[in-house]
Structures are given as C-alpha cells and as structure tokens.
C-alpha cells in the first residue's frame, strides 16, 4: 500500500502533479500548508494533519466545510491505533469526498511531517513518498531526513523527493537499475559511525569490502555505469541520494 505525503516545504507543483500521475497512490496526506497544493489542484487528500500554523485560514476552512468528521486526536492515541482497527477503506482519489482532519497543538514533541508518516504507517502503508520536505529550512530538511530512519526501522520504504533529488535510507543492500535512476549521480553517506563490508558494483567508482566512516566525502557523486548497480554491506546505515542537475 503506497502513500503520498505533501509537506509544507518548498514544492515544485508541476513536478508534484507529474509525480502523482506517474504513481497510483492508495492514500494521500496533506501536511499543514501542504494542503495548499491539493486546494489549488482541486484534489481531496484522504488525511489532513498538522497544527495548521502555516496554512492560509481560508484553505483550511474550505476543507473543513467538506468534512463530516473532524477527527482531532492526540498523538498518543494515533500512535496506539493498530492497522486492524483503523479500517481505512481504499478508494479512488476522485471519489474521495471528505478528508479526515487530525489537528494538533503547536507545542508538541513531533513535527507535522513525523505525524503524517506515523499516520501512513498506522494505516498499513509499506511505501511512502514525501514531497515538499526539502527547501530553505535546512533544520526541517535534516529533520525529515532523520525521519527516514524511523520508517526504515519499521520495514517501510520511505522516499523524500523533489525535482532534483530522491533520498532514501537503507540498512540492507539495494539494487539500482540504470533505466530507473533518478539522475546521473548517486551519493552514499554513512548515517552510522561506520558502514562495514561495503561493496559497490556497477558504479564508476567501485568498492570491495570497504569500511566507510562518517564525516568523510568519499561516497559523494558516484555514477552508475552498468545496466544495474548493486550496493551491499554487512552493518550500518546508509543515506542514498540520487541527484540530477
């Protein structure tokens, strides 16, 4: 089950529309000012989450007026909700008439994007694409990158995407097909003190049983040269960034 989260960071709307057409998402979630994208595109998300401190009041009100159930609840209640009890009914987005609104207090321990990811996972999603999670606020972007680890530890594939980058976090091997690559460059950044036994095949700069350490730039800007490239390692966590100019 695949989810699309549109967060409140910088969003290239032409790219976002194209991405939605490329994939068939079972669930869409608008995060705070990210609901502006759905509003302008005349689309209805399944969920709207956040403290709503950055969205225009008239946009929020337009969705509230089309909502039967304003399901405001605490983050703790959301966290405890099981997939079995959620009873989320999949339906085509064009038939989705009324979103579920989850509103939270501005003073909280989790960002709105974290709440959105937890919402998707609680509904049984095993793949999550996040748009609008990069931009001018480096602290928010770094926080969103860290959230990839939360999803990874629960066995959920989570991607941050914008027009130029596709970012994921892995704790096991990965195969990248050249025909499906996101851009010309693949960067590998250790997210643990060491990534041991790292072997890269099908890349311009291969490695064999290498120990890659944090705080070095060795893994930046590699390139796929074969029909497919393989990343394997024994232990650690890697951030994989596919980029294009």
Regions found by a protein language model. Name each.
Residues 165, 170-245:
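Long, charged alpha-helical interface segments
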Residues 150-166:
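Short, acidic/small-residue loops that bind anionic groups at enzyme active sites
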Residues 135, 139-149:
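Short Gly/Thr/Asp-enriched flexible loops that form oxyanion-binding sites at enzyme active sites
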């Amino acid at each position: 089950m695949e989810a699309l989260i549109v967060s409140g960071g910088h969003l290239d709307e032409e790219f976002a529309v194209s991405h939605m057409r490329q994939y068939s998402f079972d669930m869409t979630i608008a995060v705070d000012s990210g609901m502006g994208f759905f509003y302008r595109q005349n689309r209805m998300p399944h969920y709207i989450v956040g403290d709503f401190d950055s969205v225009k009041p008239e946009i929020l009100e337009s969705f509230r007026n089309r909502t039967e159930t304003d399901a405001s609840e605490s983050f703790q209640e959301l966290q405890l909700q099981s997939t079995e009890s959620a009873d989320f009914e999949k339906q085509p987005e064009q038939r989705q008439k009324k979103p579920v609104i989850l509103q939270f207090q501005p003073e909280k321990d989790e960002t709105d994007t974290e709440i959105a990811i937890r919402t998707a996972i609680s509904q049984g999603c095993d793949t999550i694409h996040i748009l609008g999670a990069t931009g001018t606020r480096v602290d928010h972007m770094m926080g969103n990158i860290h959230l990839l680890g939360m999803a990874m530890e629960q066995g959920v594939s989570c991607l941050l995407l914008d027009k130029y980058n596709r970012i994921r976090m892995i704790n096991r091997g990965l195969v990248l097909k050249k025909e499906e690559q996101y851009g010309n460059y693949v960067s590998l950044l250790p997210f643990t003190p060491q990534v041991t036994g790292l072997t890269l095949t099908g890349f311009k700069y291969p490695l064999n049983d290498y120990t890659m350490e944090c705080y070095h730039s060795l893994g930046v800007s590699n390139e796929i040269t074969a029909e497919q490239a393989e990343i394997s390692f024994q232990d650690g966590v890697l951030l994989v960034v596919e980029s294009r100019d």
